């Protein structure tokens, strides 16, 4: 798993430290790795609730994003474990049974302040911030690294996504799960204020609640940044 690499492992550790230090959030992780490996043990150390879950459509994804397709279209091959990991967020609506809303984040985040439900949008489906642009009025594509999900609403979108998987239908709105989410949800989404998905390349923002190391990671190289 890519998260077991030292640089990604350390990013996850920073995410967990900042979440525990600066928030009152209940931390939950969907996990498809080996029990007892370093990432699993780190999650346990920070008392994260671990839900063991395997994607039900791995075969479909491997056919949609074949090694040949990735080499031709992307100019590089990507580990399937990395792709499967990002698609885990699609599973949240069918796993969550208690809460109406869920805050999802990637593992390359700094929690700079507490996150309270009353301060967040309450979308019919999901709320997200822009991929690159800071001006939300010009947003043409959202970043899926931080999402506020309406669980009931996203169950509808999940069923639509499953139908696309059955048909081996690749998203026309972008790569991997973020492309599917934009295709299914962009016209129905609400705006998540950029303070909840602040990118370091935008500069310093003392009001940023969540800092997202989007693209270039600390200690990574240009090839890994995509």
Predicted regions and their residues:
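Active-site-proximal specificity loops/subdomain of glycosyltransferases
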Residues: 37-96
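Short, solvent-exposed loop/turn segments at the edges of secondary structure
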Residues: 141-144, 206
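Short internal beta-strands
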Residues: 26-33
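GT-A fold catalytic core of metal-dependent nucleotide-sugar glycosyltransferases
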Residues: 81-141, 148-149
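Short, acidic, metal-binding catalytic loop of nucleotide-sugar glycosyltransferases
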Residues: 18-25
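Active-site regions of enzymes building and remodeling cell-envelope glycoconjugates
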Residues: 43-54, 124-127, 207-211
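A glycosyltransferase accessory/donor-loop signature
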Residues: 1-2, 7-14, 62-63, 151-226
């Amino acid at each position: 798993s890519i998260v077991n690499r030292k640089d990604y492992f350390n990013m996850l550790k920073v995410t967990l430290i900042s979440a525990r230090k600066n928030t009152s959030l209940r931390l939950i992780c969907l996990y498809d790795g080996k029990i007892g490996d370093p990432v699993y043990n780190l999650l346990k150390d920070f008392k994260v609730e671990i839900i063991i879950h395997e994607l039900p459509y791995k075969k479909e994804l491997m056919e949609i994003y074949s090694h040949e397709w990735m080499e031709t279209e992307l100019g590089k091959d990507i580990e399937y474990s990395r792709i499967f990991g990002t698609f885990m967020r699609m599973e949240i609506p069918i796993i969550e049974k208690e809460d109406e809303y869920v805050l999802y984040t990637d593992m390359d985040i700094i929690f700079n302040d507490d996150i309270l439900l009353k301060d967040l949008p309450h979308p019919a489906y999901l709320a997200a911030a822009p991929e690159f642009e800071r001006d939300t009025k010009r947003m043409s594509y959202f970043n899926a690294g931080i999402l506020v999900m309406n669980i009931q609403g996203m169950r509808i979108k999940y069923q639509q996504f499953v139908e696309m998987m059955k048909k081996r239908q690749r998203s026309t709105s972008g790569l991997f799960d973020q492309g599917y989410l934009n295709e299914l949800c962009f016209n129905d989404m609400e705006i998540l204020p950029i303070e909840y998905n602040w990118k370091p390349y935008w500069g310093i923002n003392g009001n940023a609640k969540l800092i997202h190391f989007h693209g270039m990671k600390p200690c990574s190289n240009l090839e890994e940044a995509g």
